[in-house]
């Protein structure tokens, strides 16, 4: 009996010892899991922060509206050309010296020169990268233009008897049409030029005068970055750079779009709060304060707004 009791006691002790060992192992295992889970969470957090920083790097900020591929963003796939070209008048550009303020990548500038036959057109933009894009597009257009010239020359020079083509194809054309034809065959690189420039702060008023000046979707960015004073400076410089009777074509952004872009920089956020001159007063300012004589709403005659460019376009005459 005594032995049996001793054996039972020893067995219970061993069971308790085993249970204690198991519980200790369990605690240790749990303790080991905690830092592992914490490490995993930390690693996940670090990866999340890394991804966020990558996203921030990828999300470029354009405080001057100098968006990359701006025209691709604004023009829909089913549009063959910039719809604003349809409201511009040929007589404002044909054989004229023109200036495009805030030209971005130069697509609109080049198309105006090609379609309307400018004598010269200069595109200026504050962003070096956009001007580089503009030069690239110009070289591309010139190559395309030059690739068609040999066949045109051949067809116009073959056959003195007119079987293959007349030697004087412009005889039956009006003077305006003949001028347009000569402008189209002229190398675009001799007509179009681009340069980096902060128009508000650096434009020298002793420079050449222009017959037509464009400022398309630019006023908001001047306004947000330089306030009311910067906007008045822009309008005043444009007026002084225009020839008498010259045309200023403006596409102002509505006030609502100011609100959407006010936080692109500390400067724009600060200026947004102090702006007094709203876009609905621009006509009054340009006519009564700056000195333009007349204004024409170019978009009022359109039956419907084109997708991407549904803003008002105004033409002021000096």
From Swiss-Prot:
Species of the source: Arabidopsis thaliana (Mouse-ear cress)
Positions with biased composition (Basic and acidic residues): 16-34
One Pfam family this sequence matches: Bin3
Superkingdom field: Eukaryota
Family, similarity comment: Belongs to the methyltransferase superfamily.
Protein name per UniProt: Probable RNA methyltransferase At5g51130
GO biological process terms on file: methylation
PANTHER family documented for this protein: 7SK SNRNA METHYLPHOSPHATE CAPPING ENZYME (PTHR12315:SF0), BICOID-INTERACTING PROTEIN RELATED (PTHR12315)
Transmembrane segment boundaries: none
Function: Probable RNA methyltransferase.
Keyword Methyltransferase (UniProt): yes
Top EC category: transferase
GO MF terms held by the record: methyltransferase activity
Domain Bin3-type SAM: from-to ranges: 82-318
Gene3D superfamilies found in the cross-reference section: Vaccinia Virus protein VP39 (3.40.50.150)
Phylogenetic placement of the source organism: Eukaryota, Viridiplantae, Streptophyta, Embryophyta, Tracheophyta
UniProt entry keywords in alphabetical sequence: Methyltransferase, S-adenosyl-L-methionine, Transferase
Region (Disordered): 1-61, 146-184
EC number: 2.1.1.-
Composition bias, Low complexity: 37-52
